[in-house]
Amino acid sequence: MYCIAILTDQEQEGQDSAEYIRNYCTEKHVFPLIEIYQNQEQFFAQTLKVVPTVVFLALPGVSGLNAAEHLRSLYPKCGIIWCSDLDFSLHAFRLRIEYFFMKPVEEQKIKEGLSIWFECKKVR
């Protein structure tokens, strides 16, 4: 089973993102476990037990950059879809992030990121 983690600092954004991800996955007949985290410490503690297949990272500014760097260093094979309020596209490229976009969080952008990840991994 796939596990998709959402790490955000805004509760409503996390709920909306989970709904967008759920809709996309249902269309693809994939039914992952979706977990939402608003606390980086809790998120990274949980990854020691279960490494998510994909992480949707939506944290502002440098905290998002730090989380992306930390996540990539710990789990280089984990898929990352990263949304930021700042243009960290060059950092995302350097970190081999599967998909980067700038806020606002929109369903179409999340779907594009998931499509790229699914295509790279040939998930069926």
Language-model region placement:
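Conserved acidic carboxylate
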Residues: T8
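Acidic, metal-coordinating helix/loop segments flanking the phosphotransfer/catalytic sites
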Residues: I36-T53
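Non-catalytic signal-transmission and effector/linker regions of two-component phosphorelay proteins
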Residues: M1-A5, Q15-A18, R124
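A general structural signal marking secondary-structure boundaries and capping sites
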Residues: C25, T47, K121-R124
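CheY-like receiver
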Residues: T53-V123
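Two-component/phosphorelay signaling modules centered on CheY-like receiver
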Residues: E11-E35
